[in-house]
Every structure is written in C-alpha cells, then in structure tokens.
Amino acid sequence: MRKILGITMGDPAGVGPEITVKALQDPKVYESCKPLVVGDAAILERACRFVGAKCTIHPVADPSEGLYEHGIIDILDLGLLKPEDFAIGQVSAAAGDAAFRYVRKVIELAMDGKVDATVTNPLNKEAMNLAGHHFSGHTEIYAHYTGTEHYTMMLAHNDLRVVHVSTHVSLREACDRVKKDRVLEVISIADKACRDMGIAKPRIGVAGLNPHCGEGGLFGREEIDEITPAIEAARTAGINAQGPIPPDTIFSKALGGWYDIVVAMYHDQGHIPLKVVGFVYDREKQAWSAVEGVNITLG
C-alpha cells in the first residue's frame, strides 16, 4: 500500500517549487508513494510554467482528497502567497514566513496521522528569522513542535551515514559544544537509528575534534576530557562505539565498510565528506551533474 508523503514546497523565492515539480514528473515516485505538496498552489503553478512541466495542479483541503496520479500534483493549498507578493531569488520575511508555515503544517499533518512521513524542500534561514521564527533549521523546528528533547541531524548517501554533535552554530561555538553528555547522546541516537534501519549490530565511528585527535593533548584536550569518556560510557551501555578517530581518516574507513555510521563533532566535519561523495560538478557544463544524499532528522 502506497504511503502519503507530505512534501513542503520550501522557500517560495528559492528552488523548492521547481525541485518539487521536477521530482514529481517521474512516474516512479507515484509507484512508490502518494506525494502531497504543502504550500501555495499559485506559486507551484508558476514553477510548472517555468520548468515547462506538463502537469495539473490539484488543490485539496485535506490529504484524503488527493488523487495521487502521475501528471497531477496534489497540493494542500495554504493560500499564503501569490507570485506578486515577493521577488524570486530575494530574501524576504514574507517568503520566510510562508516556508516556515509549510513546515509547521506538514508536522501537524504527520502528528495527526494524515500523512505517513514528511519530506522538506530548502528554506532560507535568514528569511525565516526575519519573519520572527527563530530556528536554525528544519531539525530544530521538528524537535520543537514534536516535543523532542534528544535529537540530531543525519546525512546519508548510500552506505555513508553521518550524525552531528552540533550543526548550525559558529565554529567557535561548535568547539564549546563538544561535551561528554552531548557526544554520548548523539552516539546513542545513532545506535538506535541504525537498528531502526535494520542494522542489528551497528558499528559507530566517533571522530575527534582536533588535528590528529589532539596528539595526547598537545593540540587540544577535547578528545581526552570529553569524547573518550563519552565513548567509554557508550561501550559500557553495550554500544559498539569506536574512537576517537582522526577526522581526516575516519570517513575513508567508513566508505570502506569499517563503520555503519560516523559521529561528527560539527557541521562541516560531517557535511564536507558526504557532499564530496554525493555531489559532482561538471567542469565543461559548469553545472552540477549529480546532487545525491538526504538529510534525516533523528530523535
């Protein structure tokens, strides 16, 4: 039985509407699920014209009204914006507010059992904050409105999976957030996530923070004072956590099948290796030829 996926349209001034339309041109999507866009019908109609898509926009008031047929894009039309209300490619509070409200609505639908899962298009954090919604990203919005205290972000591309101790904070603050309790929390979330994905005995690689894992404290003591104690506590709890492993080698080992998931200490430490693997830029065409990978909220 096909499940209903609630798909946010993303920031209406950004690429979200176009991505949505292009993705739903593939008939295989409809073979595997029932996609329901949450957004503004007028914006999605413009995106259809812009990309030259042959499809019909079908506004609905409830997921039960969706047709879920290829060639028809069902959208829960919130009626927040029209094309003339904002400029494409420009940061604005109006677009940021709409993008936030799409996410809020899809969470509501999921919690009410009206959609089986959610998928989010990009939002602009600056625009969202201009609108008065002070969150640093999707992960934090989901955690807040589901009442989830323990959570993290996971990136995945094929068998490479990465979770993060911190994400959308400055590098200076990220270093301050490397604490035993938080590292242990993320290791535990990673272990449960792997088990939920069918990995019976997850092997968790934990990255260090400093060059060469601090070289015995010469280049920083986070590995000694925070990360290693967290790993030891996890192992005592029966979790197969290994490390700390130098950040410049742990991802090669993960790609080689040594770990099922990697715990990164901060945003770019985890994002860069995954995007090096999943993103391919064509020098001749001066365009991306592949952009693969997904961001999954855990907790």
What positions do the PLM features span?
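Helix-enriched interaction subdomains in cytosolic or periplasmic regions
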Residues: 121, 128-134, 157, 161, ...
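Active-site glycine-rich loop that binds ribose-phosphate moieties when present
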Residues: 140-149, 171-195
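Contiguous, glycine/small-aliphatic-enriched amphipathic segments in soluble metabolic enzymes
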Residues: 1-138, 183-205, 209-265, 269-294
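Short coil/turn segments at secondary-structure junctions
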Residues: 89-91, 170-178, 214
